[in-house]
């Protein structure tokens, strides 16, 4: 059975999450792929209008006082029929809550968490880790890729210290260094970590064919 691919993007406000999502879609969007983007906070930047205006991409805003629930995900699956869901997660909320939702037996039958990304601002990392460690550690621990944004704001010694702390929390994560938010698109475009999975592309094509045949 084809499962909806889920990518979760975590990080505090102004860490570069929305810019990253724009860059990720620009690099990995497959022809006829239907994507739903769930935005759980309102940042300084917005989803690129060229992305929002695509017929096969739907942007949904989740109010701050609301949560991503099993019911919401079932509704999205039923009414939007996405191939991929990208969640921009609220950095002040515990990722474990979302993890519990995604671990629901029925949700796991239709959704599959593929990649978790975490973006952090090098200039505020230590402050947040000291004061909000319980919230910050969870997304780092479960992330596949951690992006260190605003590297230009700190010296090399500080960068190495941050990387050391990250690897203590998550020894297997990939760490990418970015000079500033304006450089995120270039890094995503050039990195081999962000690619179109050929097996996903094939499964997607087969699923589109199956749906078309079913609708006849």
Question: Which stretches of residues belong to each language-model region?
Answer:
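C-terminal accessory "lid"/substrate-recognition subdomains
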Residues: 155-216
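Alpha-helix boundary/capping detector
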Residues: 39, 47, 124, 128, ...
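Short, hinge-like loop/turn segments at secondary-structure boundaries
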Residues: 53-56, 135-136, 192-195
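Residue-level detector of flexible, active-site-proximal loop/helix-junction positions
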Residues: 66, 123, 182
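Short, low-complexity, intrinsically disordered N-terminal peptides in bacterial proteins
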Residues: 1-2, 215
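Phosphate/Mg2+-binding loops and adjacent switch elements
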Residues: 89-165, 170
């Amino acid at each position: 059975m084809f499962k909806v691919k889920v990518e979760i993007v975590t990080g505090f406000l102004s860490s570069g999450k929305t810019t990253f999502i724009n860059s990720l879609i620009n690099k990995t969007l497959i022809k006829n792929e239907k994507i739903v983007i769930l935005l759980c906070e309102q940042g300084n930047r917005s989803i690129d209008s060229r992305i929002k205006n695509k017929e096969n991409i739907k942007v949904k805003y989740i109010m701050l006082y609301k949560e991503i629930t099993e019911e919401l995900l079932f509704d999205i699956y039923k009414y939007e029929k996405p191939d991929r869901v990208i969640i921009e997660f609220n950095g002040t909320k515990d990722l474990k809550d979302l993890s519990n939702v995604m671990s629901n037996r029925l949700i796991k039958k239709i959704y599959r968490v593929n990649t978790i990304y975490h973006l952090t601002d090098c200039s505020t990392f230590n402050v947040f880790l000291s004061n909000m460690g319980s919230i910050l550690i969870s997304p780092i621990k479960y992330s596949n890729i951690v992006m260190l944004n605003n590297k230009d704001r700190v010296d090399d010694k500080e960068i190495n210290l941050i990387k050391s702390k990250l690897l203590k929390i998550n020894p297997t994560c990939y760490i990418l260094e970015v000079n500033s938010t304006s450089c995120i698109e270039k890094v995503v475009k050039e990195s081999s970590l962000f690619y179109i999975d050929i097996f996903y592309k094939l499964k997607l094509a087969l699923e589109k064919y199956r749906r078309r045949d079913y609708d006849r």
